[in-house]
């Protein structure tokens, strides 16, 4: 997916993520920024602090998910399935797109 380099995790996007990604592309966002983040996550490495990576807690819809900031108002919601070694890309978009 998206030309990722050698990775520890298989990367799978939900249908919602894929739809939102098309919107992000239409908005002119730099997809290379997303690919940079995905390469780190899919390798099982820790993101740099600038991405403000954190677990989403107290949210039934995003149970066991994490969120990072690709840009100040461009987020990625994802989760790992370590049993199957998969990185699931749940959603991407702005704060208002994802939490309203």
Where are these regions (language model features)?
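N-terminal first-folded block
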Residues: 13-40, 46-48
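Enriched for short, Lys/Arg-rich terminal
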Residues: 1-7, 19, 26, 31-32, ...
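A short, surface-exposed loop/turn module that caps and links secondary-structure elements
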Residues: 42-69
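Short structural boundary motif marking the start of a folded domain
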Residues: 7-13
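Generic leucine side-chain signal with a strong bias for well-ordered alpha-helical environments
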Residues: 38-41, 56, 87-89
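A secondary-structure boundary/capping signal
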Residues: 13, 52, 91-94
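Residues that form or immediately flank small-molecule/cofactor binding pockets and catalytic motifs
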Residues: 16, 58-61, 94
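Short, charged low-complexity linear motifs
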Residues: 1-5, 37, 60-65
């Amino acid at each position: 997916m998206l030309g990722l380099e050698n990775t520890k995790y298989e990367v799978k996007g939900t249908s919602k993520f894929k739809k939102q990604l098309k919107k992000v592309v239409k908005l002119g966002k730099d997809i290379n920024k997303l690919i940079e983040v995905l390469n780190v996550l899919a390798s099982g490495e820790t993101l740099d602090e600038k991405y403000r990576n954190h677990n989403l807690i107290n949210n039934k819809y995003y149970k066991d998910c994490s969120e990072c900031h690709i840009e100040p108002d461009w987020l990625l919601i994802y989760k790992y399935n370590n049993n199957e070694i998969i990185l699931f890309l749940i959603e991407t978009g702005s704060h208002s797109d994802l939490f309203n």
